[in-house]
Design a protein with these regions (language model features):
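Eukaryotic scaffold repeat domains enriched in small/polar residues
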Residues: 1-379
Length: 379
């Protein structure tokens, strides 16, 4: 696949992109120095971040951060000064047990989904608690992906460990459903392959953990479109109003998993573990003939404020950092952008990029970078 090709198959547009963009001069550029940094070594109180699961930039230039370790939604102004905190650990109204990232629900409203209680909490951008809604028919788990243009919410529901779950590596289905703002399931968009997990049966429990070099399906919502991307291959499916509209492909060469890759990941997972039965299970899990031959085709996806699709590489580039492929709204690959290694993108606006990284001491920070779009990157 050496050149861009666009074809139609039974009413579905298939956009096949080459591995690189000819004459790629960069459709976007990201500043090397952040405009705003929150957290890091020496930070105290509300500025001390741990397991920041998400962040959004507010209309007034401020930032809201979900600090997962304390189940708090923290609001900061445009200079990084802490303004207020909403929520705490608990199961009551305005409290969270296992909160996900804050998501937009309208121009002045945020929504946070608690996977432990299967409850969506709506909060104003000024920090006021608006309402909490229990999702009907959902026992827990899942991930809230965003709001669609018709006002419905998009929720991915996966099955957890249940009685009778067999040991081994598996990919159970994830069901993508649309919800009303009252927590009622309207319809199901589809069922897709979930994350690849390894199931271990211990003496008194069943444990599920990520499989080595795990394949998984990523989801994103933007306007009336839903993006579904299984990184077993470089292919992103785009649904509009519940119907498959477009498939975006890119030509990539499989990157083989080497013996050193296996040993490095195994050592990271082993850590300081000493339990003999667990170590024996880990050895079996990482046997060469039990592993895939190559890495997943990509890392994750994000849809920006212009409706463009960003797809990250699975592994860092040789010089450090991660390459992100950027596709326009028609599915055409426009350019590739390098971002710092370890920086987890949470939101891409028209002129900014917001995410979570670590400082030189390994302490979490939320960082806001300026982003410029060239003529070819402007909508």
């Amino acid at each position: 696949m050496g050149a861009l090709s666009v074809r139609d198959s039974s009413g579905v547009q298939i956009v096949s992109n080459p591995a690189t963009v000819r004459g790629d001069s960069g459709c976007v550029s990201v500043d090397s120095v952040p405009m705003l940094t929150i957290g890091g070594a020496g930070a105290e109180g509300s500025y001390d971040l741990l397991r920041a699961s998400g962040a959004l930039r507010l209309p007034d230039g401020g930032v809201v951060v979900m600090n997962g370790a304390t189940s708090e939604l923290r609001f900061f102004d445009h200079s990084g000064r802490h303004l207020r905190t909403v929520g705490r650990l608990g199961s009551g109204p305005g409290e969270f047990r296992r909160p996900g990232a804050p998501l937009w629900f309208g121009a002045d409203t945020l929504v946070v989904y608690d996977t432990w209680t299967a409850r969506a909490t709506f909060v104003s951008t000024r920090g006021g608690l608006l309402k909490s809604v229990r999702i009907e028919g959902v026992a827990g788990g899942g991930e809230l992906l965003g709001r669609l243009s018709d006002g419905s919410l998009l929720l991915a529901i996966a099955r957890g460990v249940t009685e009778g779950t067999e040991p081994g590596v598996r990919r159970d289905p994830v069901h993508l459903v649309r919800l009303s703002t009252e927590g009622v399931v309207r319809d199901t968009i589809g069922s897709f392959r979930g994350p690849e997990v390894a199931v271990r049966i211990a003496e008194s429990s069943t444990v599920m953990t990520g499989a080595p070099f795990s394949r998984r399906t990523f989801f994103a919502a933007a306007g009336d479109r839903v993006f579904v991307a299984d990184n077993a291959e470089y292919r992103v499916r785009v649904y509009a109003n519940g119907r498959l509209e477009r498939i975006i492909e890119k030509s990539v060469e499989a990157v083989p998993i080497t013996a050193s890759d296996i040993e490095r990941e195994k050592a990271q997972r082993r850590g300081s573990g000493r339990d003999p039965s667990w170590l024996a299970w880990l050895d079996r899990l990482y046997q060469r003939d039990q592993l895939p031959a190559s890495f997943p085709a990509f890392g994750r996806i994000v849809v920006d404020a212009e409706g463009w699709l960003w797809v990250s590489a699975y592994a860092p580039s040789p010089g450090g950092g991660f390459a992100w492929d950027i596709f326009d709204a028609s599915g055409r690959l426009r350019c590739t952008c390098q971002l710092p290694s370890g920086f987890r993108v949470r939101e891409v606006g028209r002129d900014y990029l917001l995410g979570v990284g670590s400082d030189a001491d390994g302490v979490e920070q939320v960082r806001l970078y300026g982003l410029r779009r060239s003529a070819q990157g402007a909508h």
